[in-house]
Structures are given as structure tokens and as C-alpha cells.
């Protein structure tokens, strides 16, 4: 009877929107809808491609594993698949101009990887010609589906990892991607490494007697989007034992605030951490030119601003699945007396 099928839940420590259950003939991955947590976003039934399809499968999208020719929309997931040793399973990509990985650029030049165009409006003919075994893309709230690619009968893997609110929760999704690409042992050991490094760094920060207050980001247009207190970034500041000026805020995403509101709260912050995308690195004079109000911040006057130029630095490509790298940067910025963490990887002090 149904009752005697042995299952074993694969224990996940941090991810809140992912459940993995292994059965003898297949694995079920259930993705919780991050925008409506009582509902399921998607259920996948992972069946080894080498085995015949079992007769009685539960409801869900059947994916034959390991994937050997996937279309991967985002550079984050390309980078992860590469780190899992499954690079040859990437058959196509979208948004090539945002993908900094040299191996991907070379693959497209050589013709071993198809350039499927713009992720928002992919080249259907390219995708059809490729016959991929799955398409990995990031879902959006109320996206109203994925248009024509849904009719191709190719499994769509909804990469909702970015909606996890803890950095380790997001990184733990690599275990799902490991199962998809036949790299589960590698993914499990990589995640164990990330987890232990993160915990060790967190402990180092807790032992520090330095306690600096921190504000982040810049205004864009009329609004300044600051990370909510419960967002990934807000929680990272907390794990780095920095006093984040919006720590009390309850949002798990970014919140748009007026400049005055941020200034009232953060004008006296010890450290200011910014990310931007420009041809050349930003300086204090650039900040002043951009918006004179910035010069009123204590961190501007004391020259304690750190910037990450995402045009040159693989911040968005690496940090989702290596939050320990980002935590190490934040700890070195917020606890300058800790001098043996290998130097900054993403941020640097602004020049004049």
C-alpha cells in the first residue's frame, strides 16, 4: 500500500520556502509561495534520467536529473552551477551583458552556449532549437506567468531563493540546485563550508568590543531605498554586530524613504556602506556632485564611507551563495581592529 513507501526529508536548517523529500525512486522539491506563504509556488518531482519513469508519481512538474542542457537566466545561478562543477550542463543563457563569468562569455563565442536574448523577452526560436531539459528563471510577484515559454513543455524551475530573508536561508537553496544538476554531494559540502565559515565569523564579531552604527545605500531619484530591519542585508548587519540604524524596522525588503527621514535617523552613523554601478569608482567629490545633502552625514565628514562598484566587482554574482564572503567584508568594516580576515573583497574606502 501507499503507506509503506519510505521517505526521508532532507533536513534544511535555514531555508523557509523550500522542502526536499527523498523517496526511493524520486525526490520531491516543494517551493512555498513567498508572497502567499499558505500556498505552494511549485512542486517538482526529480526523477533520475537513467531510470524508467515510475508508474505512480505525485502531482508536480517532472524533471529528469541530472540536467544536461539547461537554459539559465541569471548570472547568479550560472556562477553557482559553475561552482558545483556542472558548468557543461548550461546550454543557454539570457542577459549575456550582465554575465561576468569568462567561461560563459567564451562558451557563447564558441557556440557551445546559446545566447537566448533578454530574460524579460527571450528568443523563443533559440530556446526551441536548443531543446533544453529545463529553464531556470527568477519568479516575480504577480508576474502573470512566463508567457510563451510555458507552452513549450519544458520544466520551468522557479528560482525563488532570492525571497529568503536570511542569507544562509538563501544560500541553502544550493542543495536543491545540486540535486537538479547531479551535484548533490558537492552542494552539500559547499553549503556546510559556507555555514561553518558564517558561524565562525559571527562568533568573531560577537567577541569584538567595537560597536559602530551603520547606514547603507544612496538615494535614487526622490526615494532612498534602505534595507528593512528584517531584510537579508539588515540581518547581515546584525550578524556582523554593527548597529544598523534601521534595525528596529520590521520589513523584510527595501523601504523607500525621503532623504530627510534617512538623515534624521542616520546623520550621525559612524559608517556608511554604498553599492553603485559606474564606469569608474566613486569619490567623495562625486557624492557631493550627485547630491549636496550627502555632505551633511558624519560618515562623509569623517571619511568613513565604503563603496562597492558592482560594475567591476562580482558582488551580485557571488554573495547570494557565499554570504560568508560578504559577512567577512562587513565585519572588517564594522570592526576595523579585526585584522586577519584576508582584506576586503567587495568594498573599498572612497577616495577624495
Question: What residue spans do the PLM features occupy?
Answer:
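A ligand-binding cleft/hinge motif common to bilobed small-molecule-binding domains
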Residues: 141-151, 276-288
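Short, structured coil segments at secondary-structure junctions
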Residues: 86, 152-153, 240-241, 301
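Extended, charge-rich intrinsically disordered regulatory tails
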Residues: 287-299
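Flexible, glycine-rich surface segments
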Residues: 196-197, 201-285
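Extracytoplasmic substrate-binding proteins
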Residues: 112, 123-125, 129-223, 247-248, ...
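Catalytic-loop region of hydrolases
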Residues: 7-39, 48-49
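Short, small-residue-biased leader/transition segments that mark boundaries at the very start
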Residues: 3-5
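A short, structured surface patch at a secondary-structure boundary
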Residues: 30, 35-128, 134-141
